[in-house]
Design a protein with these regions (language model features):
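Membrane-lumen/periplasm interface segments of specific transmembrane helices
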Residues: 73, 194, 212-289, 314-320
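Membrane-embedded, lumen/periplasm-facing catalytic core of multi-pass transferases
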Residues: 372-469, 572
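Transmembrane-helix motifs of polytopic, lipid-linked glycan transferases
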Residues: 89-109, 147, 151, 287-288
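Hydrophobic, aromatic-rich transmembrane alpha-helices
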Residues: 198-199, 273-317, 341-352, 392-402
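Membrane-interface alpha helices of multi-pass inner-membrane proteins
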Residues: 118, 163-178, 186, 226, ...
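Short acidic/glycine- and proline-prone juxtamembrane loop motifs at membrane-interface regions
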Residues: 133-140
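Membrane-interface transmembrane helices that cradle and orient dolichyl/undecaprenyl
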Residues: 110, 148-164, 174, 197-201, ...
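Membrane-proximal lumenal/periplasmic loop motifs of glycosylation machinery
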Residues: 28-37, 51-75, 79, 84-85, ...
């Protein structure tokens, strides 16, 4: 850390960062919405709406509900604002936190020019946009990681313990967004030892540097404890447990040896372009470290930026190989490497511009080129891909490490990022998906409908086989933890083990793309001694057609009545009586 905070960021830098979300929204209008069929993202959206009910009666305790550092801000947003306004405010807050924190970090290491370049590149990089724009927890992990390091560097530089305490609070929030983020702690802790040369330059060398380090660590740890205690109070207030984090810890231990989503070998690399950038920056940073001409320009801050990326990457690789697997193959875990990758890009690879007019031009070209690549036509495909794409990305980043002039370096980096957008847009997870905005509206309307009938206890969903609206149904049922509540997805076909999930008093929701799909309920469940009392029928309109929701309460049928109902050729749910 060699750059003093006293070198204030130019005003036009602040304006550029303030305009960045608007540019992203113009290029990717639906960036604040989750994929309509993304199960886990909608699970957390459900917690935003129903934290107290889920924590106390409906789903206690699940490891999903332990991610309170992400759930609580979402809960506040969705209980103060309308769904659309809540989504905008929530995701803009985390997006801006991440971008501004990255700018602050790189500015302290390499100056404001490199900081602005890396912040703009990060803010317009598609995996970062998607991570910070959907309701899954990886965006929260990214934002809290960058905020942790930004506050820590500010606190250590000025010897202000309250900033170190605040950094600890952010670290606790990172941990309680996903307990696996504990593996990023080593990459944060390496920033604690004092940079003696930098302190001497500014006349801040303490008499006992290691005692000062110990005190900073204590204050930082105190921040983590304070964050955990605060979330424990929230958990108890919502009807949950004070040790809200334990289900996540136990789940992680159980998953240590077996992961049903694991992939073997290395063939997955060619199909995972989100892995290309961290891998390329990793290699390029090592090139910058190993080359004599590059090593001479590496300050302590730049060395730590490289070490943080290398350390986190090695931990991820070991975790992927020796742990539960599929970590680097899964884009919402690989995204955790983005903070360290873009810190290294800004601190090590971008270089330091000395001419302000060139700096302005480079940032403008970078922003416009990357924004254009975000609207890359789906019909256009880059000639290279797979392993050739990975090799090309590594080659371009390595070139950036050996080029001496900052402007050519940045041109090469931007070219690599634009190429990555081309390969990413060809994948199902990052490619065009026109139903994000409509899915958000439909699912939130669906939540309003379901909430009129389902209050405290878990519902059970009976789904007819999907035709063209299955992604809407998957998103809506994910609000209610999907596999926890779906009894059958082929209704009226119901297996005995599925039927046993429905007992007298259970509230059942039949979702179908045709009207009267709930009619066979009595006939199907008569052998199990149940009939259905219709509570209501609703229609949920999507841009592709309507969904029909029928709400029933399962009632116990006496054995004689059940046998008669089973023999009946035509059966329908018992109508609600006045």
């Amino acid at each position: 850390m060699t750059m003093s905070a006293s070198a204030a960021a130019p005003t036009w830098h602040r304006l550029s960062l303030l305009l960045l979300p608007a540019l992203v929204t113009i290029a990717v209008p639906d960036w604040m919405y989750s994929l309509t069929h993304a199960i886990d993202a909608w699970v957390y959206h459900g917690f935003f709406h129903h934290l107290e009910t889920y924590a106390s009666t409906m789903f206690p305790p699940t490891y999903y509900g332990t991610r309170l550092a992400w759930i609580v801000p979402g809960y506040v947003a969705y209980h103060v604002f309308s769904p659309v306004a809540a989504a905008v405010i929530l995701h803009l807050t985390f997006y801006c936190t991440a971008v501004w924190s990255l700018y602050s970090i790189v500015r302290r290491i390499a100056g404001s020019s490199a900081a602005l370049f890396s912040a703009v590149a990060f803010g317009l990089y598609l995996p970062a946009i998607r991570a910070l724009g959907w309701d899954y927890v990886d965006g929260a992990v990214i934002a809290y990681t960058l905020l942790t390091l930004a506050l820590l560097m500010a606190g250590l530089e000025a010897n202000r313990r309250w900033l170190t305490l605040a950094s600890g609070v952010a670290a606790g929030a990172m941990l309680h967004s996903n307990i696996g983020a504990a593996f990023m702690f080593p990459s944060i802790l390496i920033w604690f030892p004092p940079d003696r040369a930098g302190l001497v330059e500014r006349g801040l060398q303490p008499a006992r540097p290691w005692r000062s380090l110990a005190m900073q660590l204590l204050w930082w740890g105190g921040g983590i404890v304070a964050c955990t205690a605060s979330l424990s109070i929230v958990s108890v207030s919502a009807g949950g447990n004070w040790d809200f984090f334990m289900p996540s810890f136990r789940w992680m231990i159980q998953q240590r040896l077996v992961n049903p989503w694991d992939v073997t070998g290395f063939s997955w690399i060619a199909m995972a372009p989100w892995f290309f950038l961290p891998a390329a920056v990793f290699v390029a940073s090592l090139v910058a470290w190993l080359l004599p001409q590059g090593r001479r320009s590496l300050t302590a801050g730049r060395q730590r930026a490289i070490a943080a990326l290398v350390l986190c990457s090695v931990i991820f690789a070991v975790w992927d190989w020796a742990g539960n697997g599929a970590l680097l193959y899964t884009y919402y875990y690989t995204s955790w490497l983005l903070p360290w990758s873009f810190i290294a890009i800004g601190a090590v690879l971008a270089g330091t511009a000395t001419r302000a007019n060139l700096d302005v031009g480079m940032v403008l070209v970078c922003a416009l080129a990357m924004a254009f690549s975000l609207v890359w036509p789906a019909s256009v495909r880059l000639p290279l891909g797979g392993l050739a794409g990975l090799a090309l990305t590594i080659a371009m980043m390595a070139c950036a490490a050996v080029i001496r002039q900052p402007m050519p370096r940045r041109v090469v980096i931007v070219a690599a990022l634009i190429s990555l957008h081309g390969w990413l847009s060809a994948t199902t997870d990052f490619g065009p998906y026109p139903d994000r905005a409509d899915g958000f509206q439909v699912i939130n309307r669906g939540v309003g409908i379901v909430d009129r009938y389902i209050t405290a206890d878990q519902p059970r969903f009976l789904l007819t086989p999907p035709q063209k609206l299955g992604h809407y149904v998957q998103g809506l049922t994910s609000i209610y933890l999907w596999g926890y509540t779906i009894a059958s997805d082929k209704f009226p076909e119901v297996r005995p083990e599925q039927a046993r999930q429905i007992r007298a008093g259970t509230r059942v929701v039949v979702i179908a793309e045709q009207e009267n799909a709930a009619a066979p309920f009595d006939q199907v469940f008569a052998p199990y001694g149940l009939s259905g009392r219709v509570m209501g029928s609703e229609q949920l309109t999507t841009r592709h057609g309507p969904l029909y929701l029928t709400f029933l309460e399962a009632l116990e049928v006496p054995p004689a009545d059940a046998s008669q109902s089973a023999d009946s050729q035509t059966a329908s749910p018992t109508p609600d009586r006045p």
